[in-house]
Structures are given as structure tokens and as C-alpha cells.
Design a protein with these regions (language model features):
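S-adenosylmethionine
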Residues: 1-245
């Protein structure tokens, strides 16, 4: 349940997010591989088994979870479900085979993880090579972009990132954002590099009065305020702005 998820410690909640995101990002490959290893398909009378196999396989193949830990957790999840308990042995066997068949998962899987209609559109607009490159890029967890109040090089070093030409700090750090240095003191906020450019185009705004219309969730408002502007932020979603500030 959502309440149970929110009650998890930060690190565990971050892992859950990564597992779910990885399953969605690699769903085609996961289902293909599991299908190859299941002689008769997933048990129709225990729908949760497919979910358990998907999350377990994702942990084994793409996350930094030891094979034995992913298998053990998946088996225990099956045992805890009334309808899935009888298939705990199946879960154990399939996931052990997954751990031994990693190469199968990485064999030309780009098309499997991309909706056919989308791949066709990309191919039509950009050509087959570029379409394939886009699909491959979509298979990777994106970088995290941060806008910092000041001293971008210092914060880039602290979060193990780099400063982009736009001034954004980009890092490949994964896990709970709240655990990164600078989060508690509000030294930075998450904002895509492209989203930060419009406010930077104003140049020196120190002492100027700026109206930020349609301001939620507040990233550009925070940028302008940090740069010394007197900002009036307006939006129907005021709660989102207040949360950001």
C-alpha cells in the first residue's frame, strides 16, 4: 500500500522506486526472458507471481542487489501470498536460472523495451540508427540535474557530479535525493538543465522586481530569488510553490 511505502526508511523507499522504474523501463526484455524460462507461462491462478518474477529479475540483472538476496526476497514474497505460496519453488528455480542466463537479457533487446509505434515514429523522423540510439538511451536511468544557489563547482564535487555550461550540476547519484549533501540546508533543488535556462537568460537580476506567472512547482522562482531578484510568484497551485520555497 502507499502508506506502507511511505513508512519505509529513505534508503528502502529509494530502492523500491528504482526497482519499479527498472521494471517499467525494461518490461519487454523482462517478460521475454521470463517467458523463455517458464515452460508453461506464469500461473493464471496466482497473478502476483508475474510481478514477483519481474521485480526479482530486475534486481538480479540491473540493480546492485546480490543474486541470493534477490532470490530469497522474491521467494519470501511468494510465500507470504495465499495464492502464490504454492509457487515459491517455481520462483526460486526461475530466478536462479535468470542469474545464470544474464547474456540472454542483453542480446539486442532495444526493440523489446520500446513500444512498436514509437520506434516506427522515431525511425521515420530520424532514421534507423538514430532511432536505435534513442531507444538504447531510454534503457538507462537518467542523470540527476541540480540547480545550486551558489558555488556550483563546490557542490558538484560534493555530489560527485560536474558543472554543465549552463551552470547546472549534473550527477549520476542514485538513491534517496534527501540523503545527498546539501539537501537539508537547501543548497540546491532538482531541476532539469533545460528548465533552468530561461531564468538564466535574464542575466543579472539583482534588485529587480520579477513576476513569475504559472510559477509552480517553483524552480525558476527559486532561481530568480537566489540570484537576488524580488520575485512575485503566481500560480493556481500555490501549495506546490510554497513547498518548493
Amino acid at each position: 500500500s502507499n502508506a506502507a511505502f511511505l513508512a519505509l526508511p529513505d534508503r528502502e523507499r529509494a530502492l523500491v522506486r528504482r526497482v519499479v522504474a527498472t521494471v517499467l523501463r525494461r518490461l519487454g526484455t523482462l517478460r521475454h526472458l521470463i517467458g523463455l524460462l517458464l515452460d508453461r507461462g506464469a500461473p493464471p491462478d496466482a497473478p502476483r507471481i508475474e510481478t514477483i518474477l519481474l521485480t526479482g529479475t530486475a534486481q538480479i540483472l540491473w540493480l546492485e542487489v546480490p543474486d541470493h538476496a534477490a532470490v530469497d526476497l522474491s521467494v519470501r514474497l511468494a510465500q507470504a501470498d495465499r495464492r502464490a505460496a504454492r509457487y515459491a519453488g517455481l520462483v526460486n528455480a526461475v530466478l536462479r536460472r535468470v542469474a545464470q542466463a544474464r547474456a540472454m537479457a542483453f542480446a539486442d533487446d532495444t526493440a523489446r523495451d520500446t513500444p512498436e509505434w514509437l520506434l516506427k515514429r522515431w525511425t521515420k523522423n530520424y532514421g534507423a540508427d538514430v532511432a536505435r540510439a534513442i531507444a538504447q538511451a531510454n534503457g538507462h536511468e537518467p542523470a540527476l540535474d541540480l540547480t545550486v544557489k551558489e558555488d556550483a563547482p563546490r557542490w558538484a564535487e560534493r555530489v560527485h557530479g560536474r558543472v554543465l555550461p549552463t551552470g547546472t550540476v549534473r550527477t549520476l547519484a542514485h538513491g534517496a535525493i534527501s540523503l545527498l549533501p546539501g539537501f537539508t540546508e537547501g543548497a540546491w533543488w532538482v531541476q532539469d538543465a533545460a528548465a533552468s535556462i530561461p531564468a538564466r537568460l535574464f542575466g543579472d537580476v539583482r534588485g529587480l522586481r520579477v513576476a513569475d506567472l504559472c510559477a509552480a512547482p517553483g524552480g525558476k522562482t527559486a532561481q530568480l530569488a537566489a540570484a537576488g531578484a524580488h520575485v512575485t510568484a503566481v500560480d493556481t497551485g500555490f501549495g506546490q510553490i510554497a513547498h518548493k520555497l
